């Protein structure tokens, strides 16, 4: 007789604080996992970028070269390069191993809110308060961007990249998706200034957070509103949102010191995770495991599921 398929385990949410990193770089403006989730980057108001092993709590390298606070960073797919952007209007390409600045791209007229590599890490995309997205060729010596996307009518707060698409959120209340294969631009009007936008892991949906304390799940192709998620507070700051590693939950920072988890399908609040007494400025979700990083003030907290047991020396 055939045995029944085992039921998939219900998703576990990261709610056990495993580590707190005192980052020593002023206020942490953003925290980001690298591509495989083994390391993380922290962006500091003291102009530095730091690379950590978050589970062990060890600092691996400090990157100095920005002239003002660092606001966002990303790692390349092969872990050899980093990019960052900040209040000095510059986009910086770093060599991970040496800690050296490889290139510094200038051209934005205001602070750089968000940076991403394309999948091959040959191009850096940067979104700025100057209402533009600029595409910089990592291999060229030319100082100007290879392309500028200037459809936004106000600052660009968020840029994400999939294999042939760019997703951008703007303070003008629109989320724009550039299909590079088709050469088309799709735009959806949310109405409230957008603070963060991202693709679902399966690539079917986009998640958008805005300053009306609401997250919206949209069908990527049609723009249809699939769900709304409320209960957190986001009225003043650029806060991160994302989906959990299996697309089961919507996750958002909040200005009241918590991280909120909602069931993606039901829309019901699943967990309000108390982080501290300030604004949870940034978060990052592990690509394959129930592991969350949160940034508040000058520290980063690493969270795992309740059943998690740290390996030797990692707890």
Curated annotation (Swiss-Prot):
Xref: InterPro entries: G-protein_beta_WD-40_rep, WD40/YVTN_repeat-like_dom_sf, WD40_repeat_CS, WD40_repeat_dom_sf, WD40_rpt, WD_repeat_MORG1
PROSITE patterns: WD_REPEATS_1 (PS00678), WD_REPEATS_2 (PS50082), WD_REPEATS_REGION (PS50294)
Keywords linked to the UniProt accession: Cytoplasm, Lysosome, mRNA processing, mRNA splicing, Nucleus, Repeat, Spliceosome, WD repeat
Residue ranges of WD repeats: 23-62, 65-104, 107-146, 151-188, 190-228, 231-272, 275-313
Domain of life, per lineage: Eukaryota
Record's GO cellular component terms: catalytic step 2 spliceosome; endosome membrane; lysosome; spliceosomal complex
Cellular compartment(s): Cytoplasm; Lysosome; Nucleus
A GO biological process held by the record: placenta blood vessel development
Pfam families registered for this protein in UniProt: WD40
Gene3D superfamilies: YVTN repeat-like/Quinoprotein amine dehydrogenase
Description of how the protein assembles with itself and partners: Interacts with EGLN3/PHD3. Interacts with ERK signaling proteins MAP2K1/MEK1, MAP2K2/MEK2, LAMTOR3, ARAF/Raf-1, MAPK1/ERK2 and MAPK3/ERK1. Identified in the spliceosome C complex. Interacts with PARD6B and CRB3. Interacts strongly with GTP-bound RRAGA but not with inactive GDP-bound. Interacts with p62/SQSTM1.
Annotated family: Belongs to the WD repeat MORG1 family.
Function: Molecular scaffold protein for various multimeric protein complexes. Acts as a module in the assembly of a multicomponent scaffold for the ERK pathway, linking ERK responses to specific agonists. At low concentrations it enhances ERK activation, whereas high concentrations lead to the inhibition of ERK activation. Also involved in response to hypoxia by acting as a negative regulator of HIF1A/HIF-1-alpha via its interaction with EGLN3/PHD3. May promote degradation of HIF1A. May act by recruiting signaling complexes to a specific upstream activator. May also be involved in pre-mRNA splicing.
Name the UniProt record assigns to this protein: WD repeat domain-containing protein 83
Species annotation: Homo sapiens (Human)
Gene: WDR83
